[in-house]
UniProtKB/Swiss-Prot annotation:
Catalyzes the oxidation of 5,10-methylenetetrahydrofolate to 5,10-methenyltetrahydrofolate and then the hydrolysis of 5,10-methenyltetrahydrofolate to 10-formyltetrahydrofolate. NADP(+) binds at G168, R169, S170, S193, I234. Pathway: One-carbon metabolism; tetrahydrofolate interconversion. It holds the Pfam family THF_DHG_CYH_C. PANTHER family: C-1-TETRAHYDROFOLATE SYNTHASE, CYTOPLASMIC (PTHR48099:SF5), C-1-TETRAHYDROFOLATE SYNTHASE, CYTOPLASMIC-RELATED (PTHR48099). InterPro entries: Aminoacid_DH-like_N_sf, NAD(P)-bd_dom_sf, THF_DH/CycHdrlase, THF_DH/CycHdrlase_cat_dom, THF_DH/CycHdrlase_CS, THF_DH/CycHdrlase_NAD-bd_dom. Belongs to the tetrahydrofolate dehydrogenase/cyclohydrolase family. One of its GO terms (biological process) is purine nucleotide biosynthetic process. GO terms for cellular component: cytosol. This is Bifunctional protein FolD 1. It comes from the Bacteria.
Amino acid sequence: MTTVIDGKDVAASVIETVKTATSTLERETGVRAGLAVVIVGDDPASHTYVSAKSRMAKECGFLSVQHTLPEETSQEELAALVAQLNADAAIHGILVQLPLPKHLRSEPIIQSILPEKDVDGLHVVNAGKLATGDLEGGLVSCTPAGAMVFVRRTYGDDLSGLSAVVIGRSNLFGKPMGALLLAANATVTTAHSRTKNLPEVCRNADILVAAVGRPEMVKADWVKPGAMVIDVGINRVPAPERGEGKTKLVGDVAFKECAELASVITPVPGGVGPMTIAMLMANTIIAAHRKAGRRPPKF
């Protein structure tokens, strides 16, 4: 019987851990976790995301600060705000919502956030710590961190003897996911658009992770019977069966056929997606614990 992971359920349990850790930290040390979210311009999708993040931060008991800047904000003005938040002792996590308006360069802004406050896990120092296996000192990008919660809850902390294949080599997901699996002692293959015999490579995987942005690319004959399949793709495709001009969300995995072979599989939507905001909250409470000299909770 295949287990279909309910990402909302797992995310809710992560949030419960965050809430408990937040109240304990404040009670025992007087430190209240603080998250600052910065948004520039009026992109509706970005505003929806930011509202959800700010709402969740409040629900967790954090000090939740939102800075909404006008579209015409200059590079210097945005950099000055980040510098101000870096210096603010009440703020443990800083998130600059991407994408920024076209006239702004996001990379210098992201790299100007103090690594210990970089709760998105995008700073090169955090990427470097992960690449060198330092999971205790850095902050991990939220989506791969969330996918790893699924892996740990399925296989435990030690993946010795298990083969993992990650399709996709992006800095945002593929590379950090591979590094996390490797740190847990899996034997990891990073596959991508130039990989030869991709279905054959995937058939060796006990843990198969797809993150390439190609709708339903992974078919049943790519899946080893009994494997765990994690689908990180979010693709909007036409859905004529729902009416003219209608669309639906699908992942990078042909869910129905692969679910017949996999032992554990994540759906799209409702799988990895809900974990992203949950792990942002987890990173914030981890950062607050470190700042207070306390051992952070495990997720």
